[in-house]
Amino acid sequence: MLASYASDPLKSRGRLYKEIPTSYRNEFERDRDRIIHTNAFRRLQYKTQVFINHEGDHYRNRLTHSLEVSTVARSVASTLNLSNDLAETIALAHDLGHTPFGHAGERALNECMREYNGFSHNAQSLKILTLLEKRYAAYNGVNLTWEVLEGIVKHNGPILGEINEYIAEYNKQNDLELSTYASAEAQIAALADDISYISHDLEDSIGAKIIDFNSLAELKYIDQHVVELKSKFKNISSSCLIYEVVRKLIHELITDLLWQTKENLNKEKITNIDEIRNLNYQIVDFTEKTNKNIKETKKFLHERVYKSNKITAISLKCTKIVQGLFKVYMDDINLLPVNWKMLIDSNETYSKARVIADYIAGMTDRFAIQEYNQLCSTSYITCF
């Protein structure tokens, strides 16, 4: 049974465009299915998480990462008697707005858009789901419930100060209450993302030989598992060792998250969802010690992995591709597909830049490489 402060699909605030409910799925299950059936969701399988798609068959991409986040989010929500369907749905959608080539691609596109209010993958996720996906005759987007859209936009907390242009524009017709916290389910999705990416980026980085087990000594709370497993299993293989370490790490983080969140709920005597939204801090959280460990792990990954020679070299090529494509389309909009060119408002520069950014952001790694080779490159790029 759902807790009194859970997001109940039977009490959803509904959709921007009214629809008749189905008898065999609740509203959040329906949204989950709509997201899975989008073109944007399918494209995630060819978008970079950390390692370029064709570098290896077992490295994570945006799709596998989103699936892993959704399983963590669903488990945590279920344990707390919250809506596992809502938590899962927000988790599945949280990366839809990412560019090709991961964070390097986003930084490059944001730089290209500097004079045009920049680029945000979070706002792009909202734009995809409310405008760019064309699947229904009656409206643009996929007409998701208020709770899912709120969770996607605010899963990292209230939006205060300067608001992204598209989020502000959409909010005029469907008020997402940007200054408050999102539901507990959305907060779970955000922290499930942290759990998944720090654990699995460590795993993939060891698999790619960017770091090794000795370097994990810098992270004492993780290294203790390495020492324990090596002592218990004398002949354990490296592949099995990293899997066991990651498994223990995920369990440890989830257990900590559940304990602290229950403490917060009890301390605040939460009885309904509005109390969660109107708190001055997020109700779903890790303990102070674990937050410190996570911060140290993110710093470790940034310094030892994301800034490594291998990833830096790849990032430079990715930046060149994204910026090259942006320039060539800005110079000649006739190179865009007809259906995209039609979206430009009378060849006005700002409109042109935004449409081009939407087009590039939707590309997969391989399609961006293909387009770059065809339109920009004097030296053919096949892989990195």
UniProtKB/Swiss-Prot annotation:
Annotated signal peptide: none
CDD domains named among the record's database cross-references: HDc (cd00077)
Biological-process GO terms, alphabetical: dGTP catabolic process
Record has tRNA processing as a keyword: no
Classification via Gene3D superfamilies: Hypothetical protein af1432 (1.10.3210.10)
Keyword terms: Hydrolase
Domain HD span(s) in chain numbering: 62-198
GO molecular function: dGTPase activity
PANTHER family: DEOXYGUANOSINETRIPHOSPHATE TRIPHOSPHOHYDROLASE-LIKE PROTEIN, DEOXYNUCLEOSIDE TRIPHOSPHATE TRIPHOSPHOHYDROLASE
NCBIfam families noted in UniProt: dGTP_triPase (TIGR01353), PRK01286.1-1 (NF002326), PRK01286.1-5 (NF002330)
Family: Belongs to the dGTPase family. Type 2 subfamily.
Protein name from the UniProt record: Deoxyguanosinetriphosphate triphosphohydrolase-like protein
